[in-house]
């Protein structure tokens, strides 16, 4: 389920192949949401900014040679090129302007090798979770890394968070969008959630 198995992690499917096969045998069906950006579906996260540079740095050779460690290597490359950009985010009838290094819109809970979108994020809650990284230096991001692993990054004043069923994002110039590791769209963009759109075999939530 991708280089870092983030969808499997969100669904509580074990990394061990035998245990994963047991999930299929158990046959528990679960309906999950699907996100979309300009009509392109995604399960985990669609984002603008840092993660696009990361996706470009994380080429096939890096994935094959280093696996999950390749994310850390690609992240270091992306951080050296990080620049802020201006964006306008609309949710319902509210629009706000931001100067940011990354905007991420999550449908699932995990992405990027175990980073948490938001502490309360779930793939079957009928909502999208957005965050915008509005810090001024990459060193501030380095200090926040532990918070991203736990989903508590929203407590930092440099992180703007929002929750909704749809977002529209415009930027001062067209920017690529990374959706589940693939560059599938560009701004301006509309992000939507499609509740219960897919049925999967997965452990029951209380069994995870």
Write out the residue ranges for each language-model feature.
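Catalytic core of DAGKc-family lipid kinases
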Residues: 1-102
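Residue-level signal for tight coil/turn positions that link beta-strands
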Residues: 38-39, 125, 195
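Glycine-rich phosphate/pyrophosphate-binding beta-alpha loops
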Residues: 47, 51, 104-119, 183
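Gly/Ser/Thr-rich active-site loops/lids in small-molecule metabolic enzymes
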Residues: 60-70, 113, 119-140
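A short catalytic or substrate-binding loop motif that flags glycine-/basic-rich loops and adjacent residues
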Residues: 79-81, 124, 161
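Exposed beta-strand and adjacent loop surfaces of beta-rich binding modules
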Residues: 84-86, 127, 174-176
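ATP/nucleoside-binding phosphotransfer catalytic cores, i.e., glycine-rich phosphate-binding loops
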Residues: 91-93, 97, 122, 132-208
């Amino acid at each position: 389920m991708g280089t870092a198995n983030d969808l499997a992690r969100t669904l509580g499917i074990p990394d061990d192949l035998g245990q994963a096969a047991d999930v299929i045998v158990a046959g528990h069906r679960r309906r999950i949401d699907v996100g979309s950006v300009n009509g392109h579906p995604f399960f985990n996260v669609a984002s603008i900014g840092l993660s696009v540079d990361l996706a470009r740095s994380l080429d096939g050779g890096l994935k094959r040679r280093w696996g999950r460690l390749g994310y850390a290597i690609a992240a270091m490359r992306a951080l050296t090129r990080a620049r802020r950009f201006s964006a306008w985010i609309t949710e319902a009838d509210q629009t706000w302007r931001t100067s940011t290094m990354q905007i991420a819109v999550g449908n699932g809970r995990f992405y990027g090798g175990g980073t948490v979108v938001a502490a309360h994020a779930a793939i079957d809650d009928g909502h999208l979770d957005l965050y915008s990284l509005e810090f001024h230096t990459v060193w501030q991001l380095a200090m926040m890394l532990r918070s991203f692993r736990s989903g508590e990054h929203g407590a930092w004043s440099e992180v703007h968070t929002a929750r909704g069923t749809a977002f529209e994002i415009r930027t001062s110039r067209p920017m690529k969008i990374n959706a589940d590791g693939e560059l599938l769209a560009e701004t301006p963009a509309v992000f939507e959630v499609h509740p219960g759109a897919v049925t999967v075999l997965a452990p029951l939530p209380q069994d995870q």
